[in-house]
Amino acid sequence: MEAHISVITLAVTDLEKSLAFYRDGLGLPTKGIIGTEFKGDKTHPSGAVVMFELQHGLILALYPRSELAKDANLSVGVASSTEFSLGHIVKSKQEVDALMKRAQAAGAIVTDEAHERPWGIYSGYFQDVDGHLWEVIWNPNVG
């Protein structure tokens, strides 16, 4: 089996609000909320989801927290921003600063302003409207 990740699904509290953040705030292209024809019930999840096609076939999906829990046969857990971060590499320090400002204007909470890190990168962190942690990175040694 070749190891690769095809879909990253983020559990969200408000699908419309999260859609607006990523589509309107960050500018990610999407068809919007799809799968609304699949109605859920107490034990079966609904199908409403948002998908963003990223590079190399990677999909970023947004799925209501309660529906993701049902789909995986789990209880809804407590959200934590320190479990993982998603990194986005850009081509310059100026792009880091611009994306951090754009995210903040769209409703993100900047948790760590962009600055030089001891290991040679320039990056900053923000939380999206559901608390998911993103790092925007310029690495002079990459691309």
Regions from the PLM with identified roles:
Residues T9-L60, S66-E67:
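Core segments of cupin and vicinal oxygen chelate
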Residues M1-A3, G143:
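Basic/polar N-terminal segments that are highly enriched at the extreme N-terminus
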Residues I5-T13, V50-L54, N73-G143:
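Vicinal oxygen chelate
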Residues E37-G40, E67-L74, D112, G143:
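A short, acidic/glycine-rich surface segment
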